[in-house]
Amino acid sequence: MSNLRPGDELLSPVGKPYDTLEEVIGIRPSKGSLAEYGVTYRQVDLLPDGSFDYENIKKAINDRTKLVTIQRSKGYATRPTLSVTRIGELISFIKNIRPDVICMVDNCYGEFVEEKEPLEVGADMIVGSLIKNPGGGIAPTGGYIAGKAKYVDMCAQRLSAPGVGKEVGCTLGNTRSLFMGLFFAPTVVASAVKTATF
């Protein structure tokens, strides 16, 4: 969301985001929200069968649409989780309308579950939490941003300090746990997926 500026618009073509993002976006009023900084938000809900509402997505994309956020996990909703293939189809549709729109995927709970990740099917950025899949159940805190360098750099400038960017950052003495989590994550996620199948 660090790539948004006053006057820009954030669009969710997969319905309402996690409850925890409502105050960040400004769906529920909050100091320092995107809405307070002049960023507007719109969403297009999924169709009742869980498919994308391509007709209304096309209508929703306009000259102010700067960033499209795609939440991969169903979160607290009853909709199905989005596969990487479906995400790729949606991104392709969006890029055919506006190639310059930034497509960001909230990849929480999706890491290591499929052979491909959203960056491999056209996403400009993926973001997620290290306390979920990539942390392997060990990482006590943290998050990640990956994707095209210019967009990641914009996030780094916002999340640390302008001019400093990703050269510094808080580790809270957790570096060892973070690396251990990344090391164990593929095994932990594979075990969870295998267990969930039975």
Where are each of the predicted segments found?
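Glycan-recognition surfaces in beta-rich domains, encompassing non-catalytic CBMs
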Residues: 198
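Conserved PLP-enzyme active-site core in the AAT-like
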Residues: 1-190, 194
